[in-house]
């Protein structure tokens, strides 16, 4: 039982890290999209 609990803790820890990395990646993607939108808008009005 103790071993199973430790395995579950490890899995949850890894999952938490994966979620954090995914969130950071999505945030970076959103920043890139915002920059592209600003660039596209600037090209339209120039």
From Swiss-Prot:
Cystine bridges: which residues?
none
Single GO BP term: positive regulation of single-species biofilm formation
Q: Which InterPro entries match?
A: DegQ
Instruction: List the residue ranges forming a coiled coil, or say none.
Output: none
One Pfam entry name:
DegQ
Q: Which family does it belong to?
A: Belongs to the DegQ family.
Q: What does this protein do?
A: Stimulates the phosphotransfer from phospho-DegS to DegU. Affects protease and levansucrose production.
Its name, as the record gives it, is: Degradation enzyme regulation protein DegQ
Could you tell me which species this protein originates from? Bacillus amyloliquefaciens (Bacillus velezensis)
């Amino acid at each position: 039982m103790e071993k199973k609990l430790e395995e579950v803790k490890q899995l949850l820890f890894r999952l938490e890290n994966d979620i954090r990395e995914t969130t950071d990646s999505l945030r970076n993607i959103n920043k890139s999209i915002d920059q592209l939108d600003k660039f596209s808008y600037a090209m339209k009005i120039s």
